[in-house]
Amino acid sequence: MFFNSLLTNFAALEVGQHLYWQIGNIRLHGQVFLTSWILLGALLVFISLGTKKMENDPKGLQNLLEFLWDYIRDLARTQIGEKVYRDWMPFIGTLFLFVFVSNWGGALIPWRLIKLPSGELGAPTADINTTIALALLVSLSYFYAGLSNKGWRYFEYYVHPTPIMLPFKILEDFTKPLSLSFRLFGNILADELVVGVLVFLVPLILPIPVMFLGLFTSAIQALIFATLAAYYIGEAVEEHH
């Protein structure tokens, strides 16, 4: 009885206040969709402005976008390999940009000034549902990469170099999305909570360096997420001898 009660209490725990949307029997965190749509819209506008008038000598936004393109290309080539990295560049780039914009949007935009009927806005990546969805998407992607490149030979990976590795490789398929999701969620949520507490206690000077540290951490977390996603895909398409 004690353990059942304890587990029930943990399941009922919530961090922050939420705006819920009820669709049939499904209850969604509405604030996550709102902030995601706002940030994705801003990202699309940013990319549209940067690619509106392409020039041979890039300047301004075009220069920044080309830098990001080259960076993502090098990351994908390094982690996935020369053979198929081009096929996965759009996916890795989209992951990186979404996580990066979500993290920085949570750190820079004063979402709490926007009043809702209930709940409060915040970084999409500070919600565990978002990070789990992203992590599961990565898992499905590397399964697809392995099967599309190797067919049924992909499953040889689970018994390479010895069949003893089978249970460990299966367990690894569960731990990969868990580590991806909880690492990103924990870091971004912790940053939001620390900044929120400091703004409440010392509202003038102290939160500023912490916010800059949060921006740096947010960028690093986006890079780690995209790099690990590319690495897992590269691992799936790699030929084992």
From Swiss-Prot:
UniProt record similarity statement: Belongs to the ATPase A chain family.
Organism: Prochlorococcus marinus (strain MIT 9301)
Primary location class: membrane
Membrane-traversing stretches: 30-50, 91-111, 128-148, 193-213, 214-234
Name used for this protein in its record: ATP synthase subunit a
GO molecular function: proton-transporting ATP synthase activity, rotational mechanism
UniProt membrane topology term: Multi-pass membrane protein
PANTHER family registered for this protein in UniProt: ATP SYNTHASE SUBUNIT A, CHLOROPLASTIC (PTHR42823:SF3)
Keyword Thylakoid: yes
Assembly information from the UniProt record: F-type ATPases have 2 components, CF(1) - the catalytic core - and CF(0) - the membrane proton channel. CF(1) has five subunits: alpha(3), beta(3), gamma(1), delta(1), epsilon(1). CF(0) has four main subunits: a, b, b' and c.
Entries under CDD domains matching the protein: ATP-synt_Fo_a_6
Role description: Key component of the proton channel; it plays a direct role in the translocation of protons across the membrane.
Coiled-coil region: none
UniProt keyword Ion transport, yes or no: yes
Subcellular compartments: Cellular thylakoid membrane
